[in-house]
């Protein structure tokens, strides 16, 4: 097995396959492992949404949040003076379902890398127009997840 393992490691290097690491385990015991890249922080992109939703669930279980909590009520300091009435209808449940009503994939891709909305994403998002009734339509949105996560932070 050891020879096959190291032959595979060599093949990964030779073919530049982009593998970060490999391990062979038996139950909980790691028998062999090899790391092709140094230990460093990685951007895990949308995996973060799973952790955020788990944190929301824990906060709900602890009584710190409710699915019916309203976004604008959590961040009154970020609500613009001329806010649309629909902004006050966005609830935590809408953020988790990516149906906030902003109806744009804000804070994704090139915009996020360029720092659009930074450093205050909450204030930035609460100044965006609500284009459809909250809860009515799904649009994949990093912004909705960021806002839900900020509600957890503040709870």
Regions found by a protein language model. Name each.
Residues 28, 43-68, 95, 148-153:
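Active-site SXXK
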């Amino acid at each position: 097995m050891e020879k096959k393992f190291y032959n595979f490691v060599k093949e990964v290097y030779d073919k530049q396959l982009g593998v970060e690491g490999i391990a062979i385990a038996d139950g909980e015991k790691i028998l062999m492992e090899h790391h092709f890249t140094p230990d460093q922080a990685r951007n895990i992109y949308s995996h973060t949404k799973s952790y955020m939703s788990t944190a929301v669930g824990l906060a709900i279980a602890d009584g710190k949040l409710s699915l019916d909590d309203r976004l604008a009520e959590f961040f009154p300091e970020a609500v613009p003076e001329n806010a649309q009435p629909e902004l006050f209808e966005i609830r935590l449940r809408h953020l988790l379902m990516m149906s906030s009503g902003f109806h744009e994939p804000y804070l994704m891709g090139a915009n996020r890398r360029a720092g659009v909305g930074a450093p205050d994403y909450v204030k930035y998002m609460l100044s965006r127009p609500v284009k459809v009734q909250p809860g009515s339509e799904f649009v994949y949105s990093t912004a909705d997840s960021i806002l839900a996560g900020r509600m957890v932070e503040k709870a």
